[in-house]
Amino acid sequence: MSCASEVQAQLFTHPVQIIYACVQTVLFLATIIGSLLAIVQLCKKTTIPDSTKVLLIGALFFANAHELAYFSSPFKVFKMNLFHTNTSCYPLASTLECIPTTTVLAMGISGNMLIQSALSIFRLLATIFPVCYSRMRALPGVVLLFMVLIPSFLSYSWIRSDIVLDDYQMFCSQWSANISSRANTYLEYCSYLTVAHIIINALIILRNRSVESKCRFDVQQRYLNSETLKTTQTICYLSIAQFLAMFLYSGGVLFMRKNQKNIPTLIYINVIVWVYAPPYACVSLAPLILFSLWNLKKQRQIRIQSITVQKETQEDHIRKLQLSWG
């Protein structure tokens, strides 16, 4: 067992760390409760395709996995402040002992990124083959989710491959100093991947709007393109939220590390923990899904109401058809 240095010992009991632990506890509980509510709503009959539901539930699983692993940090802060009696030695965690926690943590981050890729791929294929994909129901989502699970679970093993983990750290939710450069590269790739998701989904939205306007008299095709358009917009909003969180994290960490020499150690560590943005992305996922479901339902009700309320004569209908045909 290794004991914390004087600065590290101060961090365990510092008011900023206690406040941060309380905030992370709230985020942890909010993520779990929000995810349960989102899953209940997703399981109800909605206009969202079954495959998209499967992938969104998968995204919630990865978000909760990340939060469960990351909660080990505030839990240790509370434990050190409430039950630790030997103030002369605050124990540090061995990176070898922390492998299970860090594996789940990396799985949560990777899973959320790769789920965005799976959602983008599914929306792209649904745009190209709308009728075929509407008949396959949940099968594409199950296959894509399985393809996401394996690399997500192995991501930390790849990051720490051929590197000896023989150091100690304050929390198991921290990356080992021996793999910090690889971890930074990995998170940068996650940010680039999220940008690609936004671009792909924006292109899919433009494509579906174009196709929808061209097939106004093909009721089935127009309906399929309309559903794909609405679902793709929802996925794009989720990708933007992920991007903002990863941008805050990668940009903030890069700024802090470049100016680390000019910042006292105690202040540096107390500030940089707030820049760790994945918990913000995780807690925002369920509210975004719930809002998207509510918005889709509201839009559908408005369309149905406009059709049922609007009254027109046969002459008005023929006149509209003549105008639309040019």
UniProtKB/Swiss-Prot annotation:
Protein location: Membrane
Keyword terms: Membrane, Transmembrane, Transmembrane helix
GO annotation, cellular component aspect: membrane
N-terminal signal peptide: none
Coiled-coil spans in chain: none
Ranges per topology, Extracellular: 1-17, 76-101, 160-185, 256-270
One of the protein's GO biological processes: detection of chemical stimulus involved in sensory perception
Bilayer topology term: Multi-pass membrane protein
Ranges per topology, Cytoplasmic: 39-54, 123-138, 207-234, 292-326
UniProt GO MF annotations: G protein-coupled receptor activity; olfactory receptor activity
Source species, domain of life: Eukaryota
Ranges that cross the membrane: 18-38, 55-75, 102-122, 139-159, 186-206, 235-255, 271-291
Cross-referenced Pfam families: 7TM_GPCR_Sra
Family designation: Belongs to the nematode receptor-like protein sra family.
Protein name (Swiss-Prot/TrEMBL): Serpentine receptor class alpha-12
Organism the protein comes from: Caenorhabditis briggsae
